[in-house]
Swiss-Prot record:
<dbReference type="GO" id="GO:0106310">
    <property type="term" value="F:protein serine kinase activity"/>
</dbReference>
<keyword id="KW-0418">Kinase</keyword>
<dbReference type="GO" id="GO:0007124">
    <property type="term" value="P:pseudohyphal growth"/>
</dbReference>
<feature type="binding site">
    <location>
        <position position="117"/>
    </location>
    <ligand>
        <name>ATP</name>
    </ligand>
</feature>
<keyword id="KW-0723">Serine/threonine-protein kinase</keyword>
<dbReference type="GO" id="GO:0005524">
    <property type="term" value="F:ATP binding"/>
</dbReference>
<feature type="region of interest" description="Disordered">
    <location>
        <begin position="520"/>
        <end position="547"/>
    </location>
</feature>
<feature type="compositionally biased region" description="Low complexity">
    <location>
        <begin position="35"/>
        <end position="47"/>
    </location>
</feature>
<keyword id="KW-0460">Magnesium</keyword>
<dbReference type="GO" id="GO:0046872">
    <property type="term" value="F:metal ion binding"/>
</dbReference>
<feature type="region of interest" description="Disordered">
    <location>
        <begin position="27"/>
        <end position="47"/>
    </location>
</feature>
<dbReference type="InterPro" id="IPR008271">
    <property type="entry name" value="Ser/Thr_kinase_AS"/>
</dbReference>
<dbReference type="GO" id="GO:0000921">
    <property type="term" value="P:septin ring assembly"/>
</dbReference>
<dbReference type="InterPro" id="IPR000719">
    <property type="entry name" value="Prot_kinase_dom"/>
</dbReference>
<keyword id="KW-0479">Metal-binding</keyword>
<feature type="binding site">
    <location>
        <begin position="94"/>
        <end position="102"/>
    </location>
    <ligand>
        <name>ATP</name>
    </ligand>
</feature>
<feature type="compositionally biased region" description="Basic and acidic residues">
    <location>
        <begin position="530"/>
        <end position="541"/>
    </location>
</feature>
Amino acid sequence: MSPRQLIPTLIPEWAPLSQQSCIREDELDSPPITPTSQTSSFGSSFSQQKPTYSTIIGENIHTILDEIRPYVKKITVSDQDKKTINQYTLGVSAGSGQFGYVRKAYSSTLGKVVAVKIIPKKPWNAQQYSVNQVMRQIQLWKSKGKITTNMSGNEAMRLMNIEKCRWEIFAASRLRNNVHIVRLIECLDSPFSESIWIVTNWCSLGELQWKRDDDEDILPQWKKIVISNCSVSTFAKKILEDMTKGLEYLHSQGCIHRDIKPSNILLDEEEKVAKLSDFGSCIFTPQSLPFSDANFEDCFQRELNKIVGTPAFIAPELCHLGNSKRDFVTDGFKLDIWSLGVTLYCLLYNELPFFGENEFETYHKIIEVSLSSKINGNTLNDLVIKRLLEKDVTLRISIQDLVKVLSRDQPIDSRNHSQISSSSVNPVRNEGPVRRFFGRLLTKKGKKKTSGKGKDKVLVSATSKVTPSIHIDEEPDKECFSTTVLRSSPDSSDYCSSLGEEAIQVTDFLDTFCRSNESLPNLTVNNDKQNSDMKTDRSESSSHSSLKIPTPIKAMIRLKSSPKENGNRTHINCSQDKPSSPLMDRTVGKRTVNNSGARKLAHSSNILNFKAYINSEDSDIRETVEDVKTYLNFADNGQI
């Protein structure tokens, strides 16, 4: 392979585009995307494109760079120990997600264990961005004068991925002053690094676990947070209190998380608190950002009405697909209240409140299915059912009122326990072309009933995996770190991680770093194999960008129009029975519970086949083709 050029970085001046190779040898299988490859209609629509929340953020990139620059440090490599990066000694894996994975590490300067989130700049999954998104972004960059030469699809996706990371770091840098938010320490990057390294505080118990054999089981993780008299209700109340404080802080900062779920809530044994993590999908109110734009408020409202997050945790006001007559979301902070309600319901009932065989059936149930039968007079239970999971957003409790209820022990609701809002029992139906189309499909398929005890199969597919809990010494000694942390073997009854693997090699993520330092060994190991090995470890339920995500069914219905790479399978075809990470199942008694969620909600085996309906000779079905086209436009653009 010929010498490689500089790789784009979080801080653009570290690797100016003029010094970068736009087409690399490992990307020759993917033809470059050029303006001539686009249709005239696309060029026309681009010239008339409305400003968006994303484009306004892009136009103010210098302000964002000024805010994140103090937290981004250049990578250096020790010439004696290849298992270190800067001051961090890297240890065992702590889990993986759709876009990267986390390693346990020890900071010699801080004298404590930290978490290092490693995000490859080149997306693992080529389906992460559609061809339309990539072409639109290239055209935008050209129109702004940011690029002057043709660019390959892979190079464009790399830059888009870096922008996504930049936004997440920007958000995390503004949210560092609350104990219930995972604290950003710093980020590491280099023009020779294939990955971005985000360093945060270590949460020793990992992601919030909720799936258990029996509804009344108490998970070992819970007992380390609630020390005395731990029960399902006391633990759920603890999570509610901690998350309420976290959301109150986000509200004060003008931040809407948009992806609250168990896998984005981390538990720390030392502080005995739950913390919110992963701000890649969040947005900030225009008033809270350090720049302004005449179109910002309108763009913000349009962004709020895009489906972002994990299907089972999405609020009903976002589930009205295809109805473009009005915006259903006016208070973005109540999206987070609903998602928190779903999370608490999972803890209380050991199941999701709404789930279907595919995401559209899930959306249908979120809108239509009532939870009134779950009201039982219990204060915590009814607070969750009647106030957090209130379908009518105008009646759903606000974060300010939730704080008051928890701090003053106010009554849950002025209404009788046996009552529930009319919107929850008989929600208003808003007919649109997409809703009409899927209504027909679901009618033809026939609805399948799921009994309470038959929930396990669906529930596991509906949840994201849980980061393993890893024990460390409270005061780890630097000299014996390799034995106390890097080679630790936690109690198998408490943890589900594969911890016997070797420490990560920095050479897997740095390309020809030694070209600028002859005293260092040659570090030219490519990380493609590492990325390939980790592809099956990814969670498929997270957002794909800071501003918009394509759900798996959207990726599926694009059919032939997605970027392709040799050796890559679309995530729709991934095996659902194969574990999604090297995490091991936790054995409880004679039964096994896998809180890692090997199968994901969106990867339903009975996902809808659009081609079968489009190609059908049935006249009734063919009438829906226009509705399909309407949805395809919605899937790519977030609007009709």
